[in-house]
């Protein structure tokens, strides 16, 4: 008989974030994978999506798991290798800023979730996503509001995505100095806005975001005005 959601097994209160996974596992719908994204609201840098399937006996090893936004950087960095070690499978996808601009944030996010799940080395029996329905998956799925604080597999995916993106933004700070990417990770803080105004957008800024587009428009207008005010000297071609 085919299993369906909601499972007939009663969802009982259990320790940590394992309630949803435990119910699905008991109903024969495992392994259960969680999928989550980081960087959706940033105006610079990639959108990063991770999928993670945890083994049913690995929750105690990851007792500190929680929504990545609630964890300190130190705790996230400590959890990252543990998740990689104890996960049945995980996959991290980077959606570059140019693709975010081309597709739009929401469409890029859904596509990233599809890619992350498809990239898992173990095919999940069920997928839990953080808040968004993910059409086009080859397995049953369920959006969970506040999922990164309600399901261990989503929390694990959240940590994988957050740490992966933060590390990339720190490296980007060296590639594009002056913007402070290592500090604000591409989000629109006051310091980032000031740097963006002074330096103009770099290739990693998302032109589809209005604050970046305004600065880019002003920069292009100023450059055009400068060219008109100081036209190039004519040359006779004789060298």
Curated annotation (Swiss-Prot):
Manganese or magnesium. Binds 1 divalent metal ion per monomer in the absence of substrate. May bind a second metal ion after substrate binding. Residues 225-239 have a biased composition (Basic and acidic residues). Pfam families: RNase_HII. Its EC number is 3.1.26.4. A divalent metal cation binds at residues 36-37, 130. It catalyses: Endonucleolytic cleavage to 5'-phosphomonoester. SUPFAM superfamilies: Ribonuclease H-like. One of its GO terms (cellular component) is cytoplasm. One of its GO terms (biological process) is mismatch repair. It is found in: Cytoplasm. Its cofactor is Mn(2+); Mg(2+). Keywords: Cytoplasm, Endonuclease, Hydrolase, Manganese, Metal-binding, Nuclease. One of its GO terms (molecular function) is RNA binding. InterPro entries: RNase_HII, RNase_HII/HIII, RNase_HII/HIII_dom, RNaseH-like_sf, RNaseH_sf. It is an enzyme of class 3 (hydrolase). Residues 219-239 are annotated as: Disordered. Residues 30-221 form the RNase H type-2 domain. PANTHER family: RIBONUCLEASE H2 SUBUNIT A, RIBONUCLEASE HII. Belongs to the RNase HII family. Endonuclease that specifically degrades the RNA of RNA-DNA hybrids. This is Ribonuclease HII. It comes from Mycobacterium marinum (strain ATCC BAA-535 / M). The lineage of its organism: Bacteria, Bacillati, Actinomycetota, Actinomycetes, Mycobacteriales.
């Amino acid at each position: 008989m085919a299993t369906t959601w909601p499972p007939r097994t009663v969802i009982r209160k259990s320790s940590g974030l394992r309630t949803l996974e435990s119910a699905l596992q008991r109903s024969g719908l495992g392994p259960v994978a969680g999928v989550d994204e980081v960087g959706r609201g940033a105006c610079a840098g990639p959108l990063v999506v991770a999928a993670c399937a945890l083994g049913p006996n690995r929750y105690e090893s990851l007792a500190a798991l929680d929504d990545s936004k609630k964890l300190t950087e130190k705790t996230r960095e400590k959890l990252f290798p543990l998740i990689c070690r104890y996960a049945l499978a995980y996959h991290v996808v980077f959606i570059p800023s140019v693709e975010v601009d081309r597709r739009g944030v929401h469409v890029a996010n859904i596509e990233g979730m599809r890619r992350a799940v498809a990239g898992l080395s173990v095919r999940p029996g069920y997928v839990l996503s953080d808040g968004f329905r993910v059409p086009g998956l080859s397995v049953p799925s369920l959006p969970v509001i506040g999922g990164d604080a309600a399901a261990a597999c989503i929390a694990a995916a959240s940590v994988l995505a957050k740490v992966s993106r933060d590390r990339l933004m720190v490296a980007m700070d060296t590639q594009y100095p002056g913007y402070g990417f290592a500090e604000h990770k591409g989000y629109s803080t006051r310091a980032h806005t000031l740097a963006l105004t002074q330096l103009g957008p770099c290739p990693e800024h998302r032109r589809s975001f209005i604050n970046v587009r305004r600065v880019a428009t002003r920069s292009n207008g100023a450059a055009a005005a400068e060219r008109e005010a100081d036209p190039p000297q004519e040359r006779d071609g004789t060298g």
